[in-house]
Amino acid sequence: MKTVKILDSHTGGEPTRLVLEGFPDLGTGDMESRRKILSEQYDHFRRATMLEPRGNDVLVGALLCKPVNPKASAGVIFFNNTGYLGMCGHGTIGLVASLAHLGKIQVGTHLIETPVGDVEATLHEDHSVSVRNVPAYRYKKAVEVDVEKYGKVTGDIAWGGNWFFLINDHGQRVASDNLDQLTEYAWTVRQALTAQGITGKDGQEIDHIELFASDTEADSKNFVLCPGKAYDRSPCGTGTSAKIACLAADGKLEPGKLWKQASIIGSQFIASYEQAGEYVIPTIRGEAYMSAEATLFMDENDPFAWGIQL
């Protein structure tokens, strides 16, 4: 019988499952090398914690790791039901809030190691968390893709810790009672990008689609389709970072100015950035709340101990 101890939280409605104990030893390398070991040798642990019957397609997993740098508070590897994420904004907020809940960190700024670089996260007195993300940038502006049923769709390609295709002019109603249509549209766009060889830098896959609309309570509202075809309940930290990079590139948002990004369910992140040459360094602030603490059991007699794979 294998066991995995977890602590679940949600950030703006989007869940994070922090893995505390039970995964194999991944060595002492950096987070990217440990992610590679996990992916190539022990991926069944990811599947067990993310896939049904113990997980679902909305969950983002965060494996808590001992950091390489002794000054860092934690290392983390992010994953979901389809594979691995370079960075996760809402997940980092969830991680920091969870560490505070466990009494492992106090109010202040903490260094967090991720597979795509180190980030700074600040736990505030009001228990909100600010994440100073990895450098973000717009890779290409106004890229056209031919999408079945919808014709030409134009969007920007940007990096915010993951690769995004950001669409402002889409003709879709961005509302919580239109989720099926938004999902179908965004998924069709993603398939078209793949089919037409439209990628991020160095051929990296664009696995997030982000649609924007106006909002009465924020500067913008978004719908973000994640790699596993689930929509992000939060405003998406890496997606908001990609948005900030595009706004900065267009001269529509000055360094230090606040941008309020709402999600499809109305939760909000507050974002700003610093200019760093051709890149921007986004800071995303949000709140996370604990939702469950549990031990997962993987019984050797259970045919679905390592997840249901369809």
From Swiss-Prot:
<feature type="binding site">
    <location>
        <position position="232"/>
    </location>
    <ligand>
        <name>substrate</name>
    </ligand>
</feature>
<feature type="binding site">
    <location>
        <begin position="237"/>
        <end position="238"/>
    </location>
    <ligand>
        <name>substrate</name>
    </ligand>
</feature>
<dbReference type="GO" id="GO:0047580">
    <property type="term" value="F:4-hydroxyproline epimerase activity"/>
</dbReference>
<dbReference type="InterPro" id="IPR008794">
    <property type="entry name" value="Pro_racemase_fam"/>
</dbReference>
<comment type="similarity">
    <text>Belongs to the proline racemase family.</text>
</comment>
<comment type="function">
    <text>Catalyzes the epimerization of trans-4-hydroxy-L-proline (t4LHyp) to cis-4-hydroxy-D-proline (c4DHyp). Is likely involved in a degradation pathway that converts t4LHyp to alpha-ketoglutarate. Displays no proline racemase activity.</text>
</comment>
<keyword id="KW-0413">Isomerase</keyword>
<feature type="binding site">
    <location>
        <begin position="89"/>
        <end position="90"/>
    </location>
    <ligand>
        <name>substrate</name>
    </ligand>
</feature>
<protein>
    <recommendedName>
        <fullName>4-hydroxyproline 2-epimerase</fullName>
        <ecNumber>5.1.1.8</ecNumber>
    </recommendedName>
</protein>
<feature type="active site" description="Proton donor">
    <location>
        <position position="236"/>
    </location>
</feature>
<feature type="active site" description="Proton acceptor">
    <location>
        <position position="88"/>
    </location>
</feature>
<feature type="binding site">
    <location>
        <position position="208"/>
    </location>
    <ligand>
        <name>substrate</name>
    </ligand>
</feature>
<dbReference type="Pfam" id="PF05544">
    <property type="entry name" value="Pro_racemase"/>
</dbReference>
